[in-house]
Amino acid sequence: MTFSVERVRADFPVLNREVNGQPLAYLDSAASAQKPEAVIGAEAEFYRHGYAAVHRGIHTLSAEATARMEAVRQQAANFLNAGSAEEVVFVRGTTEGINLVANSWGNANVGAGDNIIISEMEHHANIVPWQMLCARVGAELRVIPLNPDGTLQLDVVPGLFDPRTRLLAITEVSNVLGTENPLAALIALAHQHGAKVLVDGAQAVMHHPVDVQALGCDFYVFSGHKLYGPTGIGVLYGRSELLQAMAPWEGGGSMIATVSLTEGTTWNRAPWRFEAGTPNTGGIIGLGAALTYVSQLGLTQIAEYEQTLMRYALEALRAVPDLILYGPAQRKGVIAFNLGQHHAYDVGSFLDNYGIAVRTGHHCAMPLMARYQVPAMCRASLAMYNTTEEVDRLVAGLQRIHKLLG
């Protein structure tokens, strides 16, 4: 099927609204993507006609809800090309998935004198859990520095590994710079040193196909709400032998096999031992609808359209005086910028007056802001429903702001 942005836009009700008297130009999908009618409808239909608590229920609605939930687990496994549905853990989002690994695998496998490697471009969700783990156990956190263009200093990376390196935690695509990291080479290097690899895929899964078996990563995590799905649901992929060896990090219902006041508790097998309590079943149903939606459009076709739009945007933005762009020429999803010495909040507020939604601030990447010696940046993100006309409006808006503010 040929990709049609007009057909895609027709599936997203919010794109019909106006903001401040102007048609909405939503350029903030990297923070959270809008939802197609298919996702909204699937979740609403579940709550209207199919809701019940999953697991252990013998009545029809419970059995149906359980089957639908487990079907989405298989669907997510297929989406990532995982080896089995039992390698998919439902989590609240990328942040919870990383914390799960840090608190379960990390507590058991990282000790005093060991080290973990991250990069300078990471989202706080892929920094803070490892800082907390290192503080708990007396390990060292090592950081891959960046080049001025926002790519990794790859020549430094081999020297960061040693026999005490336990984990490389790395983003696939930077949420600020759009840098796409060379995962295959990094994963191979980590494995040569006996280290495991966790990939933060939050900014990647909506932009291109992901194959965790081809990558060879040990853990991969993403959030549904950035993939046109609901909030409060995400996926943690973990290699089966790792998940089965990991202890649960939360206790409660569903994650147990047996509970005894005298003999203690035994755990369910993975992935269910990591899903304590009543799950976000509606969110899981919505996630399944989102996976179906993007799969039917074709991630390869989506990627081709978005890359064409990105090239158009980077060229068009050259017409804005005093615009400072951050990040490499080859990027995915996002364009971070500042306009002269004007604060990002001021620029973002003016753009909002023109009906253009961008993100402003440190983007949960304060170390990256420190690297560029700025308190904040504006970030325009491009999704499959954005258009060249919206890019033109962004350019015109920035030109107008420059003229007004000088």
Curated annotation (Swiss-Prot):
Pfam family, one: Aminotran_5
Catalytic reaction list: (sulfur carrier)-H + L-cysteine = (sulfur carrier)-SH + L-alanine; L-selenocysteine + AH2 = hydrogenselenide + L-alanine + A + H(+)
A cellular-component GO term for this protein: cytoplasm
Modified sites of kind N6-(pyridoxal phosphate)lysine: K226
Pathway: Cofactor biosynthesis; iron-sulfur cluster biosynthesis
Biological processes annotated in GO: cysteine metabolic process
Location (main, coarse): cytoplasm
Localization per Swiss-Prot or TrEMBL: Cytoplasm
Entries under InterPro entries matching the protein: Aminotrans_V_dom (IPR000192), Aminotrans_V_PyrdxlP_BS (IPR020578), Cys_dSase_SufS (IPR010970), PyrdxlP-dep_Trfase (IPR015424), PyrdxlP-dep_Trfase_major (IPR015421), PyrdxlP-dep_Trfase_small (IPR015422)
EC identifiers of the protein: 2.8.1.7, 4.4.1.16
Molecular function terms, GO-annotated: cysteine desulfurase activity; pyridoxal phosphate binding; selenocysteine lyase activity
Presence of keyword Nucleotide-binding: no
Cofactor entry: pyridoxal 5'-phosphate
Keyword annotations: Cytoplasm, Lyase, Pyridoxal phosphate, Transferase
Transmembrane segments: none
Active site residues per record: C364
Family the UniProt entry places it in: Belongs to the class-V pyridoxal-phosphate-dependent aminotransferase family. Csd subfamily.
Protein role: Cysteine desulfurases mobilize the sulfur from L-cysteine to yield L-alanine, an essential step in sulfur metabolism for biosynthesis of a variety of sulfur-containing biomolecules. Component of the suf operon, which is activated and required under specific conditions such as oxidative stress and iron limitation. Acts as a potent selenocysteine lyase in vitro, that mobilizes selenium from L-selenocysteine. Selenocysteine lyase activity is however unsure in vivo.
Record note on quaternary structure: Homodimer. Interacts with SufE and the SufBCD complex composed of SufB, SufC and SufD. The interaction with SufE is required to mediate the direct transfer of the sulfur atom from the S-sulfanylcysteine.
Protein name as it appears in the record: Cysteine desulfurase
Gene (UniProt): sufS
